[in-house]
C-alpha cells in the first residue's frame, strides 16, 4: 500500500464515526449512531446528538486505530468534518480532533462534510475523470456540483431552493405514520406500489420555472401535494394506499433528480456522474440514475450503501486528497462552520 495515511473523524449529525484510509485503500471504518435515541422525537435532537458524540468519540477513534493496527503516531494527518452540520455536534468532533492533532503533533484538516461525500467514491471507483459531475442528495442537501479538482475547486451547478429530497421524504413519512427515519420505510413500501397511481408534481422541470432554474431543485411542492392528497382521502373516509403513495412519491423525486443530473452532464459534456449522500441509498433513485445514465452514455458511480450514509471514510478520503494536492493544513484554531458553503473545501 502507498499514499498518505489519514484518520478521518465525522460528527455532523447523529453519527459519530472514525476511519483510517491509506491512499485509496479503506483500512478501517467505525460508525456509532444515536439514531435510536432520536426516534421517539421524530427527528434529530441536537442536544442528545451532541451528548452521544461526546460519549462515542474516544471509543470510535480507538477502535478505528485498533482495527487498522495503528496508533496515532502512524497517521500522516487528521481530517475532521468542520461543517456544514449541527453546531453542537461539529464542536464535539472538531475539539476532539484538535486535541488528538496537538497531542500527536499531526497536521489537521477541517473539511467540508458534503465534499467528503464526493471524495469517498474514489475508494470504490478510483480517480475522477475530467469534467465529473456530482449529485449530492441527503436530508439537508440536494446539490449538483462540477468537480474540477476535489481538493481545490468545486463549482455549484444547482442546489435546493427549499426542502431537500431527504426532508421531503421524512415529512411525508410522518404523515403516513412511519417512525424516524422515514426514508427507508418509504423505500420499502415503494417497491410494492404503483408509481403511476397518484399524480405527484415534478418541481422546477417545466414551464418558466424550469427554464429559470434548469439545475436547481424544489421539493416543498411535492411534499405539499402529497400531504393534500392524503388529507382529501382521509376526509372522504378512504383508506390510504400506502404502497402507491410511496411509489408515486419516490418515482417523482427520482425522476426529477435524474433529469436535472443528465441535463447538467450535457451542459458540462460530462461522461461521469458521482452520486453521494444518505438519500443515495434509496433504491428507486439508484435504479433511475443507472437507467438514464445508460441512455445518455453517462457512467453513474453510486457507492455501496455503507459509504452513502455519514461515515469517517469520506472525511479521511478527502483528507488524503488534500494532503496529496499539497493543500496547507488548517490553522489549529479554525472554527466550525455550520453553514459551510459548498465551494469551501477545507478551512
Model-predicted regions and their roles:
Residues 1-4, 111-133, 318:
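Conserved phosphate-binding catalytic cores of ATP/NTP-utilizing and phosphoryl-transfer enzymes
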Residues 3-84, 117:
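N-terminal beta-alpha supersecondary unit
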Residues 15-21, 134-136, 142-146:
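Short beta-strand scaffold segments in enzyme catalytic cores
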Residues 29, 71, 188-273, 284-296, ...:
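A contiguous, well-structured pocket-lining segment that forms one wall/lid of small-molecule binding clefts
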Residues 72-82, 269-279, 301:
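Short glycine-rich phosphate-binding loop at a beta-alpha junction
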Residues 80-104, 123-124, 283-292:
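Short Gly/Thr/Asp-enriched flexible loops that form oxyanion-binding sites at enzyme active sites
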Residues 110-111, 290-315, 328:
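Conserved phosphate-binding/catalytic loops in two-lobed NTP-binding clefts
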Residues 126, 149-194, 223-224, 228-234:
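Glycine-rich phosphate-binding loop plus the immediately following alpha-helix
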Amino acid at each position: 500500500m502507498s499514499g498518505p495515511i489519514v484518520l478521518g473523524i465525522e460528527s455532523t449529525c447523529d453519527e459519530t464515526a472514525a476511519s483510517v484510509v491509506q491512499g485509496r485503500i479503506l483500512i478501517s471504518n467505525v460508525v456509532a449512531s444515536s439514531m435510536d435515541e432520536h426516534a421517539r422525537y421524530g427527528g434529530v435532537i441536537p442536544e442528545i446528538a451532541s451528548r452521544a458524540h461526546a460519549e462515542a468519540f474516544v471509543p470510535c477513534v480507538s477502535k478505528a486505530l485498533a482495527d487498522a493496527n495503528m496508533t496515532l503516531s502512524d497517521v500522516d494527518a487528521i481530517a475532521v468534518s468542520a461543517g456544514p452540520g449541527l453546531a453542537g455536534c461539529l464542536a464535539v468532533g472538531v475539539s476532539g480532533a484538535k486535541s488528538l492533532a496537538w497531542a500527536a503533533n499531526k497536521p489537521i484538516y477541517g473539511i467540508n462534510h458534503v465534499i467528503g461525500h464526493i471524495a469517498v467514491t474514489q475508494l470504490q471507483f478510483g480517480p475522477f475523470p475530467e469534467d465529473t459531475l456530482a449529485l449530492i442528495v441527503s436530508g439537508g442537501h440536494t446539490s449538483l456540483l462540477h468537480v474540477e479538482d476535489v481538493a481545490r475547486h468545486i463549482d455549484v451547478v444547482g442546489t435546493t431552493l427549499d426542502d431537500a429530497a431527504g426532508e421531503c421524504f421524512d415529512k411525508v413519512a410522518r404523515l403516513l405514520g412511519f417512525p424516524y427515519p422515514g426514508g427507508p420505510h418509504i423505500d420499502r413500501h415503494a417497491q410494492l406500489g404503483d408509481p403511476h397511481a397518484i399524480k405527484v408534481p415534478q418541481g422546477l422541470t417545466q414551464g418558466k420555472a424550469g427554464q429559470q432554474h434548469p439545475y436547481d431543485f424544489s421539493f416543498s411542492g411535492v411534499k405539499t401535494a402529497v400531504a393534500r392528497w392524503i388529507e382529501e382521502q382521509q376526509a372522504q373516509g378512504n383508506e390510504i394506499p400506502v404502497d402507491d403513495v410511496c411509489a408515486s412519491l419516490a418515482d417523482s423525486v427520482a425522476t426529477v433528480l435524474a433529469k436535472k443530473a443528465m441535463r447538467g452532464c450535457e451542459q458540462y459534456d460530462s461522461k461521469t456522474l458521482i452520486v453521494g449522500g444518505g438519500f443515495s441509498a434509496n433504491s428507486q433513485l439508484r435504479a433511475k440514475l443507472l437507467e438514464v445514465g445508460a441512455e445518455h452514455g453517462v457512467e453513474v458511480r453510486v457507492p455501496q450503501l455503507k459509504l452513502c450514509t455519514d461515515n469517517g471514510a469520506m472525511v479521511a478520503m478527502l483528507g488524503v486528497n488534500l494532503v496529496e494536492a499539497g493543500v496547507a493544513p488548517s490553522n489549529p484554531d479554525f472554527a466550525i462552520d455550520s453553514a459551510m458553503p459548498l465551494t469551501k473545501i477545507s478551512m
